[in-house]
Amino acid sequence: MRTTEPRRRKIVLAVTGASGSVYALRLLEKLQQLKSPPEEIAVIFSDTAREIWEAETGQRYVAAFPAKEYGNKSFYAPFASGSSQFDTMIICPASMGTIGRIANVTSDDLIARSADVMLKERRRLILVPREAPYNLIHINNLKSVTEAGAVVCPASPSFYSNPKTIDDLVLTVVDRIIDLAGFESNGFRWMEND
């Protein structure tokens, strides 16, 4: 009897110009440390995201295996096509400008194009907005992407794990994103951790 190994996952992580780069940093670190990590992590920065990343985290982003960085104007990236094997895209943090372009199918950069591909192919698209408060345009755009199949997971930390540090709070959001992406996370679970 022949057994087949489970397919290793390929995901896209897009970082946009919204504040909250620490969520993306911790997400990337945690994805690489999973018991069954993704086979490949494609990383894309929007035009202002790298600048904000460096200002907020105090460090430059350098891709390390299994992560590979793609330019936001690089439409020849494999996941810009529905024929690719990338099955999940996470936009974290997701600026309202990016969400608006996705909601209105304005595929003018690799992030918006890849999100469009995920939606049209019925694959996982997780958007992590950090903005607050929302105006009516934001709410309508969030409604549109949700109706199209995206999961909107606001960067709202939970407190039932009794977090002690900012990083503890960040990890409550990161663990939720990892769960939504279909990976096994070892994060705190309500009424399961003593």
For every predicted segment, state its role.
Residues 1-126, 130-194:
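A cross-family phosphate/adenosyl-ligand binding-site feature
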